[in-house]
């Protein structure tokens, strides 16, 4: 399962993002996708308190207090693919730095054509990494449902019981 988190200033942008990512995901992977879409930073932060597994993050840095929030979140999700959504009013010096380290950039106003192009590039890079068996600092579970990458720093413990192996993170057991 691949988990996607989006924080956008408008619901329309989130809807367009989900649609574009779904289209590209259907073409490129057989994995199940889980989407978490937010228009408020506070809601996203509340969701992230549980430290869920996230593979891809899209974050709008034009929203108030979004950059400091993104820096805090990025500490826990260094290995997640990060797409920053920005506009001309924000200097690239704000979001192009080691504390944030975005993987791609989408400029506002978000048009369907630009979004499709950026999502296409993102999916190329992400699926290349996902198909690569050697993902550093991650535990890989392959099953009939697909691959699940669990960052080692999010694993609480691994337990063998009932002739199966269980991996426990803060929020889930696999």
Set out the residue ranges of the language-model regions:
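Conserved beta-strand scaffold positions in the cores of enzyme catalytic domains, especially
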Residues: 6, 35-37, 105
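Short, flexible active-site-adjacent loop segments at beta-strand->alpha-helix junctions, enriched
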Residues: 10, 88-89, 111, 145, ...
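Conserved binding/recognition cores within well-folded domains
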Residues: 120-174
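CheY-like receiver
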Residues: 29-33, 43-130
């Amino acid at each position: 399962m691949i988990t996607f988190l989006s924080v956008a200033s408008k619901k329309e942008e989130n809807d367009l993002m989900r649609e574009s990512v779904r289209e590209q995901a259907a073409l490129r992977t057989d994995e199940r996708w889980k989407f978490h879409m937010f228009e408020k930073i506070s809601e996203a932060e509340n969701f992230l308190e549980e430290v869920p597994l996230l593979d891809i993050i899209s974050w709008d840095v034009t929203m108030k207090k979004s950059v400091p929030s993104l820096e805090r979140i990025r500490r826990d999700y260094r290995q997640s693919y990060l797409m920053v959504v920005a506009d001309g009013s924000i200097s690239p010096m704000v979001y192009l730095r080691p504390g944030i380290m975005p993987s791609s950039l989408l400029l506002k106003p978000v048009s369907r054509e630009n979004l499709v192009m950026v999502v296409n590039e993102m999916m190329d890079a992400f699926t290349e990494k996902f198909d690569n068996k050697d993902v550093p600092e991650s535990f890989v579970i392959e099953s009939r449902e697909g691959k699940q990458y669990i960052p080692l720093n999010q694993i609480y413990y691994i337990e063998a019981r009932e002739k199966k192996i269980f991996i426990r993170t803060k929020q889930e057991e696999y």
